[in-house]
Amino acid sequence: MASETVSNHQEKALALLQADAEKILRLIKVQMDHLTMPQCPLYEEVLDTQMFGLSREVDFAVRLGLISEEQGKAMLGELERELSALHEAFTNKQQ
């Protein structure tokens, strides 16, 4: 019974983190679709705040043993790659 509860908590934690990551990914995708300026202070502030918040959530879940460190790194890494692609696309548009 206790292992079922732990497993359930782990699944819920991962699902919640993935949902938060998806929100950030959607924000990135909207920016990619419109190629709005990534240097816009509001844009940077929102994404930085969201990414920082998610990184803290991931760290907390890892420390509780709800997700593995590898899962957390993979989740954040995917978002960082998308951000990098956005900046690259915008830079290419400017040239």
UniProtKB/Swiss-Prot annotation:
Q: What is this protein called?
A: UPF0358 protein BCE_3996
Q: Which organism is it from?
A: Bacillus cereus (strain ATCC 10987 / NRS 248)
Which Gene3D superfamilies does its entry note? SO2669-like (1.10.287.750)
The protein's matches in InterPro entries, at most eight in alphabetical order, are given as:
UPF0358 (IPR009983), UPF0358_sf (IPR036270)
Which cysteines pair up through disulfides? They are: none
**What family classification does the UniProt entry report for this protein?**
Belongs to the UPF0358 family.
